[in-house]
Amino acid sequence: MTQISERFLVQAHLDAKQPKALSPEEQAHYRAAIAAELKKQDAVMVAHYYCDPVIQALAEETGGCVADSLEMARFSNNHPASTVLVAGVRFMGETAKILNPEKRVFMPTLEATCSLDVGCPVDEFSAFCDQHPERTVVVYANTSAAVKARADWVVTSGCALEIVESLMDNGEKIIWAPDKHLGRYIQRETGADMLLWDGACIVHEEFKSKQLEDMKALYPEAAILVHPESPEAVIELADVVGSTSQMIAAAQRLPNKMFIVATDRGIFYKMQQLCPDKIFIEAPTAGNGAACRSCAHCPWMAMNTLERTLQCLREGGNEIFVEPALIPNAVRPLQRMLDFTQAARLRQAGNA
C-alpha cells in the first residue's frame, strides 16, 4: 500500500508558508474584498474546522459555514448559491462538486490534499476490493472521487460507527479504507468483520500516549478529547472519542473547565468561540522541530490563505472538476450517507 514520502510532506509545509504575516489592516482589506467578491458572484464559502482561524471567521461573517466534512457537504448541497468556495482540502471540494454538479466549485488552492487520500490510490484500492468481492466497501470521506466511486458507502468520523453497526446487523462483512486507526476503533467498538487499508493521517498519528499521560498528570482536572484517527494507545486515554463536531459538543456539555485536545489545533477557534470560559490545550505530538511532521496542524489546511482565496475568486482559477463518468457512482455512496444521517437525526428529534 502507498506510503507518503517525507519529501512530499516537507513540500506541503513549504507551500503552506505565508511570504509574510499579514497586518491587521491587510487582513481587514482581504476580508472585505473577499466578502464583496462572494456577493458579486452569488457564492457561499464553507470552511473546515482545521483551517486557520481567520478563514473560519471569514466563512461565518459572509453567511457561509464552518463545519466538519459531513456538514460541509450537507450545507453545500442545501444552499441556493450557484457557486461554492470550499476552504479545506481537495476531497472536500470534490465532494461538493459530486453532490452539486450543476454548481461551480472553487478552492483557494488545488494543491491542498490529504495524506489519507494520497495513501489510497484508486488502482491499488480497486485491486484490493476485487480480491474480496463478497465484502461491502466502506470508505472514509477523506478519499478521492475515484475511490468513492468504487465504494458502496462513504462515511465521516461523525457517522462511521452507526453506519458500520447497521451494516454489521445486516450480516455484511466490510472492507474499510483508508484510515487504519479509525478502522480499528470502529472494529473494536462494533465487533464488525473488517479488512483494513493501511493509511493514516499525518496529524493524528503524531499524538503520543506517554506524553499525553504526562500532560494529564500535570492537569488532572482536564478532560481528554481524542479524534478516532489517533493511535489506539491515545484513544484509550480519552474521556471522549469523537469527530470534530462531537468533540466541540463534548467541550460544551462537560462540566470540566480544562480540556486536552488530540486533533488539529484549528478546532480551537470554534471551541473557544463556543466556550469562552474554558481552557483548551493541545495534546502533545512527537515534538516541534525536525521530529515533527505536522505539529498538530495539517500543512495542507494551512494552504487556505486570504491571498489565495481572493485570487481564486477574482481570477476564476482553482475550479474543481470531477470526471462526469465518475459522478453517478460517486454520488450514490455519498447520498446513502446523507440519507442515513438525516434519518438518524429525525429519529433522534422524535425521541427528544
Swiss-Prot record:
Pathway: Cofactor biosynthesis; NAD(+) biosynthesis; quinolinate from iminoaspartate: step 1/1. Iminosuccinate binds at H48, S69, Y140, A141, N142, S157, H227, P228, E229, T244. One of its GO terms (molecular function) is quinolinate synthetase A activity. One of its GO terms (cellular component) is cytosol. Its EC number is 2.5.1.72. Its main location: cytoplasm. It is found in: Cytoplasm. [4Fe-4S] cluster binds at C114, C201, C298. It is an enzyme of class 2 (transferase). It catalyses: iminosuccinate + dihydroxyacetone phosphate = quinolinate + phosphate + 2 H2O + H(+). Its cofactor is [4Fe-4S] cluster. Catalyzes the condensation of iminoaspartate with dihydroxyacetone phosphate to form quinolinate. Belongs to the quinolinate synthase family. Type 1 subfamily. This is Quinolinate synthase. It comes from Pseudomonas syringae pv. tomato (strain ATCC BAA-871 / DC3000). The gene is nadA.
